[in-house]
Structure formats: structure tokens, C-alpha cells
Amino acid sequence: MADKTTDTSPKGGFHTFLCVVDESEELSQALRFACRRAMSIDGNVALLYVVEPAEFQHFAAIGDLMREERRGEAEEMLQVVASSVQRQTGRTPIIYIREGGVTEALVSLLEEKGDIDSLVLGAATGPEGPGPLVTQIVQKMAGRLPVPITVVPGNLSDELIDALT
């Protein structure tokens, strides 16, 4: 498993809020909440993007190419999200890229890194539920994680998030 960590944040007693970066609509609400909370207590934001394994593994070269393409897409998306965090907080976020299943990679990161203090997840608002990651983490893992979890409803307005934080 390849891991990449870019830590350009200030060191010290900063509270770090971790957001899982994906293509979901509710990411923007979770990210805004994490950024606003970090700003209010002079904390940091960390971003995790998990590159899921390529489904086509029959030929090693093709699997490697697919993995590299996904990693490139992850890095591009993280640049955009990191720029947003920088604009909102004035600080460069900590960036983690992991490979594997999202839940497993998230739990592994939280167990390895003692400097992550809170997990912030966005919840979908559709009839199918809050989303697979929120469901898995809250229903099955919450009591075993080393950090508190904040679940931000995907339908909260920016104004309401600002008022809450």
C-alpha cells in the first residue's frame, strides 16, 4: 500500500479536523464546517483521498496504469480542495493519499496518526441514506475510533454552518 503525506502545517498544539475528499455533493458542507471550526480555534484541516484499487487486475501493466491514472486524478482533486481550504483558513492543509478501501484506509490513518483530533463527514440527504461511508463509520465503527465524529448534513446552508461554527 502506498501512502503519501504532505505536512506543511504549523506544528504545535493545533486541533486538526480531517475531511475525506471524494466526489460527493456533501463534501462542500463538511469542508466548510471543518474550515470554520479550525479558524475559530486556530486549528488545522487535513484532507484524505483514498484511491480505490483498480477493478481490472488481469494484467499487471494495465492495473499499474489504471492506478497511476487514479492517483493523478486524486492529486488534481486534492489541489482544488486544498486551495479552497487555504482560502478559507489561511493555512495549507495536511494532505494524505492512501490506496485501498475507503473505510479501511480512514480507520488505519486515524489509528496511525495521533495528531488528528476530529473526523468531519458530510451526509447525503437523499432517500437512500447518508451515504456508505457515513453509514459504515457511524453504525459500525464509531465506538472504536480514536477521535470524535461530526456528521454535517449535506443540505445545510453556508450561513447556517457559519452560525454553528
Specify the residue positions occupied by each region the protein language model found.
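General small-molecule cofactor/ligand-binding pocket signal
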Residues: A46-L48, I94-R98, T150-V152
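Short, well-ordered secondary-structure micro-motifs
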Residues: A30, Q57-A60, V107-S108, G131-P132, ...
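Acidic, proline/glycine-rich short linear motifs
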Residues: K4, Y49-E76, E159-T165
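Short, structured coil segments at secondary-structure junctions
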Residues: I41, T89, I137, R144-P146
